[in-house]
Amino acid sequence: MKQYLELCRRIVSEGEWVANERTGKHCLTVINADLEYDVANNQFPLITTRKSYWKAAIAEFLGYIRGYDNAADFRALGTKTWDANANENAAWLANPHRRGVDDMGRVYGVQGRAWRKPNGETIDQLRKIVNNLTKGIDDRGEILTFFNPGEFDLGCLRPCMHTHTFSLVGDTLHLTSYQRSCDVPLGLNFNQIQVFTFLALMAQITGKKAGKAYHKIVNAHIYEDQLELMRDVQLKREPFPLPKLEINPDIKTLEDLETWVTMDDFKVVGYQSHEPIKYPFSV
């Protein structure tokens, strides 16, 4: 929690106002933020200065792992995070590539599981990484990226947290995740959970020990209509100790994640929090 609160205070005290064309709002912005999560000791980075709904964050990333491209599939997992971008984004609604209600296009997990080659074939980036790590191989290119500029026009949203690099040192697995843009009051809450859980899951299904997860954010910002709640409410609260994340030990393969895993296979233990804060969301 300390590093999260320090970033929030840094934005409030040092940030500069930047106009955002997509949302029509101004953002208080800082450039470059680095966070670390201790996955080895299960220090689950769940925000405690407001109630955090962690299941939706894990459900969303599970949808990425499965390569989902439809908001209805994400809802079935337990998260509505793609409803607005799939169905209320004006630019996407006018895009001729949109295939109807709930279609997200070729975003996130689609790129991770079915990146298109020039000859029409696809590359399953995640499968390659899992196969290598399971064999104890780190070719220094165990990289999963959702960032495909050639297909930005085929999706409703460019990826924010776009690239994940795995590093194997002995039998300990580490993760470095890169994020181009972060809505700190709303998005970072989700993204921290996802980075931590992704490393924990990948270590579990490849038979490795989880180490540290490193989370690099380029543009960290607070929207103008979020600033008062952050400055005058959330930053006035004292944080509680971090909880633990328990993952069903029966999850042993990528196929398990693709097929039968649900939110019932995850449990957070020892979570204490302050009251919820309803921050505005910008589509």
Curated annotation (Swiss-Prot):
<dbReference type="GO" id="GO:0006231">
    <property type="term" value="P:dTMP biosynthetic process"/>
</dbReference>
<comment type="similarity">
    <text>Belongs to the thymidylate synthase family. Bacterial-type ThyA subfamily.</text>
</comment>
<feature type="binding site">
    <location>
        <position position="191"/>
    </location>
    <ligand>
        <name>dUMP</name>
    </ligand>
</feature>
<dbReference type="InterPro" id="IPR045097">
    <property type="entry name" value="Thymidate_synth/dCMP_Mease"/>
</dbReference>
<keyword id="KW-0808">Transferase</keyword>
<comment type="function">
    <text>Catalyzes the reductive methylation of 2'-deoxyuridine-5'-monophosphate (dUMP) to 2'-deoxythymidine-5'-monophosphate (dTMP) while utilizing 5,10-methylenetetrahydrofolate (mTHF) as the methyl donor and reductant in the reaction, yielding dihydrofolate (DHF) as a by-product. This enzymatic reaction provides an intracellular de novo source of dTMP, an essential precursor for DNA biosynthesis.</text>
</comment>
<keyword id="KW-0963">Cytoplasm</keyword>
<dbReference type="GO" id="GO:0004799">
    <property type="term" value="F:thymidylate synthase activity"/>
</dbReference>
<dbReference type="InterPro" id="IPR036926">
    <property type="entry name" value="Thymidate_synth/dCMP_Mease_sf"/>
</dbReference>
<protein>
    <recommendedName>
        <fullName>Thymidylate synthase</fullName>
        <ecNumber>2.1.1.45</ecNumber>
    </recommendedName>
</protein>
<dbReference type="GO" id="GO:0032259">
    <property type="term" value="P:methylation"/>
</dbReference>
<feature type="binding site">
    <location>
        <begin position="180"/>
        <end position="183"/>
    </location>
    <ligand>
        <name>dUMP</name>
    </ligand>
</feature>
<dbReference type="Pfam" id="PF00303">
    <property type="entry name" value="Thymidylat_synt"/>
</dbReference>
<dbReference type="InterPro" id="IPR020940">
    <property type="entry name" value="Thymidylate_synthase_AS"/>
</dbReference>
<comment type="subunit">
    <text>Homodimer.</text>
</comment>
<keyword id="KW-0489">Methyltransferase</keyword>
<feature type="binding site">
    <location>
        <begin position="221"/>
        <end position="223"/>
    </location>
    <ligand>
        <name>dUMP</name>
    </ligand>
</feature>
<dbReference type="InterPro" id="IPR023451">
    <property type="entry name" value="Thymidate_synth/dCMP_Mease_dom"/>
</dbReference>
<feature type="binding site">
    <location>
        <position position="22"/>
    </location>
    <ligand>
        <name>dUMP</name>
    </ligand>
</feature>
<feature type="active site" description="Nucleophile">
    <location>
        <position position="160"/>
    </location>
</feature>
<comment type="pathway">
    <text>Pyrimidine metabolism; dTTP biosynthesis.</text>
</comment>
<feature type="binding site">
    <location>
        <position position="183"/>
    </location>
    <ligand>
        <name>(6R)-5,10-methylene-5,6,7,8-tetrahydrofolate</name>
    </ligand>
</feature>
<dbReference type="InterPro" id="IPR000398">
    <property type="entry name" value="Thymidylate_synthase"/>
</dbReference>
<dbReference type="GO" id="GO:0005829">
    <property type="term" value="C:cytosol"/>
</dbReference>
<dbReference type="GO" id="GO:0006235">
    <property type="term" value="P:dTTP biosynthetic process"/>
</dbReference>
<keyword id="KW-0545">Nucleotide biosynthesis</keyword>
<feature type="binding site">
    <location>
        <position position="282"/>
    </location>
    <ligand>
        <name>(6R)-5,10-methylene-5,6,7,8-tetrahydrofolate</name>
    </ligand>
</feature>
